Structure formats: structure tokens, C-alpha cells
A protein has these predicted regions:
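Long, low-complexity, charge-biased intrinsically disordered regions
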Residues: 1-171
């Protein structure tokens, strides 16, 4: 939507997010205030290790849900980037706790469904933010870093990634 008087443009995916919540039966879930709670210590060790567990998890729409979250993240919801990046690491063999984390992200979206990206206002300022962790990936002990650039109050291209590691050898 657009507010000409305030010189602002708002981008929203409220309808899309509501459809996603319905598709995964989370439209009546209790909302949470963070994209991914600290009690989630996700690891490949939580992936199914036997055929019964794998069969049970094959009935869970994990990949579809993560794909839906990725679309929202890329278009208008950079606030879920870290959480979506975390759950996407387990797409090849998700376990029950990984699915619980995906549902947590959906609960967060349920509580923030009306959030919008806002561009514009009086001063077109440029702001940058960054964050990182040290060995936050339980399985690989890799670190993660990310940044967000805002222009005129709205997020513009952002990135979260594992840093590139270089090894020097002397011959």
C-alpha cells in the first residue's frame, strides 16, 4: 500500500502468510514473540535414524513448509532469515524437533502477520546492521554471520551465511 501524504510505501504478505498458516493448520496456534526460541538446539542427531521414524516423518510436509517460509523471508520478512536458514539445514532428513522448530516459526508469523516493510518518510537514510555467532552450528561448529541494510526505513538486500574459510599452506 502507499501513503502519499507521509511519502511511504508498505510491502506486506499478510494474505500469503494467512494462507500458509491455514495450509499447515497453524491459523489458531498460540503466537510467540521470537522467530526461533533459544531452547531449540537443532542437530542432525535429531534426524530419524530408523525406518519407522523416517516413515513417520515422511508424512510431515516439512519441505513444503520450509519452502513457504523461504518465500516469505525473501520477499518481505527478513526477520525470519536466521530461523529459516537453521531449519533448512535439515531438509534432507528432518526429525520431529526440526518440525517443531518450523511450527514455532509459523507461530511467530501468526503473531506478526500484519508486519510490513516500510519504505520512505522524510529522510532517506542508509543504515546497516550486522550480527554473528561463534561456532553456533552444533554439528559442524561453524559460525554464522549476517547483515541487514536499510534505506529509507525499509530492508534492502540482506545476507546470512557461514563465512568462507581459507587455509594457507607453505610448500
Amino acid at each position: 500500500s502507499r501513503d502519499r501524504r507521509e511519502k511511504k510505501i508498505y510491502l506486506s504478505q499478510e494474505q500469503y502468510i494467512r494462507k500458509v498458516l491455514q495450509r499447515f493448520q497453524m491459523e489458531n496456534a498460540k503466537a510467540v514473540s521470537t522467530p526461533l526460541a533459544t531452547h531449540f538446539k537443532l542437530s542432525v542427531k535429531q534426524s530419524p535414524s530408523n525406518e519407522v521414524e523416517k516413515t513417520n516423518m515422511s508424512r510431515v510436509p516439512y519441505a513444503s513448509a520450509v519452502g513457504s517460509l523461504m518465500y516469505a523471508m525473501v520477499c518481505t520478512r527478513p526477520d525470519i532469515a536466521h530461523a529459516v536458514g537453521t531449519v533448512s539445514r535439515f531438509l534432507s532428513n528432518p526429525g520431529r524437533e526440526h518440525w517443531n522448530a518450523v511450527k514455532w516459526i509459523l507461530r511467530y508469523l501468526h503473531g506478526t502477520v500484519d508486519m510490513k516493510l516500510c519504505f520512505g518518510g522524510d529522510k532517506p537514510t542508509l543504515m546497516g546492521y550486522s550480527d554473528s555467532d561463534l561456532a553456533g552450528d552444533i554439528d559442524s561448529r561453524k559460525s554464522t554471520s549476517g547483515y541487514l541494510i536499510k534505506f529509507a526505513g525499509g530492508a534492502v538486500p540482506w545476507l546470512e551465511e557461514e563465512p568462507i574459510t581459507f587455509t594457507l599452506t607453505h610448500e
